[in-house]
A protein has these predicted regions:
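Active-site helix of classical SDR
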Residues: 81, 117
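Short, small/polar-rich loop/turn modules that mediate ligand/substrate recognition or access, typified
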Residues: 133, 138, 193-195
Length: 208
């Protein structure tokens, strides 16, 4: 799948580098960033998009199930952002976007670990946004609802149909619709938007 995406992007004339790394490990994340910078130059735009689930009700949840999700989903924001933030501050420009989740806003049965990690991502966003604004760096969150990703499509079809029935627009989201929101925040015209959380969920959650 990764190779297909790389070929598609390269076909559009974009230079692409893929680097393996464990975003849950600070040393590995730093090495990953250095490898990218050596091949492509400084990182000006960072999308923190790591996400796993280890679903179970809290009274059955093991410490490992909790820690794995928090480490991958939330700690990765620190691990990957820390190596790039100084360069962004020095260059007086940057875009940092966290991909959180509707379940970080409304909670979800059996996902105390996942919901906590995704809610924490926006807490990270609004704090870093305050620290970084004067350096020309915007920091925002995108909180998708149920999108037809590999993770969601692995859910049994009858369950997916029940989920879609709860969405006012009547369907799951498409990955391109989330990418469009990310591209919006990256755009120079969005330079006055920072600390925001953009909900993209087909109307399933309308908190404000």
């Amino acid at each position: 799948m990764r190779a297909v995406v790389v070929r598609e992007v390269q076909a559009r004339g974009v230079n692409v580098v893929t680097v393996k790394g464990d975003v849950g490990d600070p040393g590995s994340a730093e090495a990953m960033v250095k490898a990218v910078e050596q091949q492509l130059g400084p990182v000006d735009i960072l999308i923190n998009n790591a996400g796993i689930t280890r679903d179970t009700t809290f009274h059955k949840m093991s410490a490992m199930q909790w820690q794995d999700v928090i480490n991958t989903n939330l700690n990765s924001c620190f691990n990957v952002t820390r190596p790039v933030i100084d360069g962004m501050r020095n260059r007086k420009w940057g875009r940092i976007i966290q991909i959180a989740s509707i379940n970080g806003q409304k909670g979800q049965y059996g996902q105390a670990n996942y919901a906590a990690s995704k809610a924490g991502m926006h807490g990270f966003t609004i704090s870093l946004a305050q620290e970084s604004a004067k350096f020309g760096i915007t920091v925002n969150t995108v909180s998708p609802g149920y999108v037809a990703t590999e993770m969601v499509m692995a859910v049994p079809e009858d369950v997916r149909n029940k989920i879609a029935a709860q969405i006012p627009v009547g369907r799951l989201g498409e990955p391109d619709e989330i990418a469009y929101a990310v591209a919006f925040f990256v755009n120079e015209e969005a330079r006055w938007i920072t600390g925001a959380n953009l909900s993209i969920n087909g109307g399933q959650y309308m908190g404000w």
